[in-house]
């Protein structure tokens, strides 16, 4: 099982890139991008708490005496990105759009700040695993800041392409996370200790992440097309026709 939802080789990072991680959370993608190539990695989120966690985690990965790469994080909304047009070479938006009512406006903002020919990697919960969670627990999607919709991947692709993108790849991720969320929804508790099945499966996920045994990596790879929790898509921003304004 991988910590990352986005596969970085599909982003095609090159030295000097500027990358935006929109809704970076605790920094898993923004920090990894910083470590992979001499780029400027920018992470934004609405949660000050998550950004503080990102700062703390980054100290473990900071590369001293290397001015060719940087990580910048700040509070900002995807509905009004504080960046000029055509600022970024790559944009990541992982597990974010399902939290936003007006997600199409966020996609339009991503298109605005991404350079022509730039790559946009995004993920949302896959329809069936998410549908089961909603059926098992109302509280799952009624919590403050929770999921406001279940996406149909084909419809979402159409929305993104209408904004001026072309999809070039797709895969699924985190199949081993699905039983955890189904158990959590089945034994939902608003407060206090989680039910035993939830605790034990969480321990398994942590062990798997830290130990990375070949068996579970193989299982995750085999099961992802069938029941991966996330659907991940990669798009390129179309260049404007000759003579049009960028």
Please annotate each region the language model reported.
Residues 1-84, 90-94, 104-107, 199-206, ...:
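Conserved N-terminal segment of class I S-adenosyl-L-methionine
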Residues 154-171:
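A SAM-dependent methyltransferase catalytic signature shared across enzymes that methylate proteins
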């Amino acid at each position: 099982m991988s910590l990352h939802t986005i596969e970085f080789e599909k982003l095609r990072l090159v030295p000097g890139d500027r990358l935006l991680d929109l809704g970076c959370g605790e920094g898993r993608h923004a920090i990894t991008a910083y470590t992979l190539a001499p780029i400027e990695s920018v992470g934004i989120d609405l949660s000050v708490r998550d950004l503080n966690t990102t700062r703390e985690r980054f100290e473990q990965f900071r590369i001293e005496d290397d001015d060719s790469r940087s990580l910048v994080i700040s509070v900002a909304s995807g509905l009004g990105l504080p960046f000029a047009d055509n600022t970024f070479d790559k944009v990541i938006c992982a597990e974010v759009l399902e939290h936003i009512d007006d997600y199409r406006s966020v996609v339009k903002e991503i298109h605005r700040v991404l350079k022509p020919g730039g790559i946009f990697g995004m993920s949302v919960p896959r329809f069936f695993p998410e549908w089961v969670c909603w059926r098992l627990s109302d509280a799952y999607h009624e919590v403050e800041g929770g999921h406001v919709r279940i996406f149909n991947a084909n419809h979402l692709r159409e929305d993104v392409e209408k904004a001026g993108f072309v999809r070039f790849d797709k895969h699924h991720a985190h199949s081993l996370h699905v039983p955890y969320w189904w158990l959590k929804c089945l034994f939902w508790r608003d407060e206090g200790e989680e039910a035993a099945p939830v605790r034990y499966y969480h321990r398994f996920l942590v062990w798997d992440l830290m130990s990375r045994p070949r068996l579970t990596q193989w299982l995750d790879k085999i099961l992802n097309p069938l029941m991966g929790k996330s659907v991940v898509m990669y798009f390129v921003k179309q260049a404007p026709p000759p003579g049009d304004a960028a």
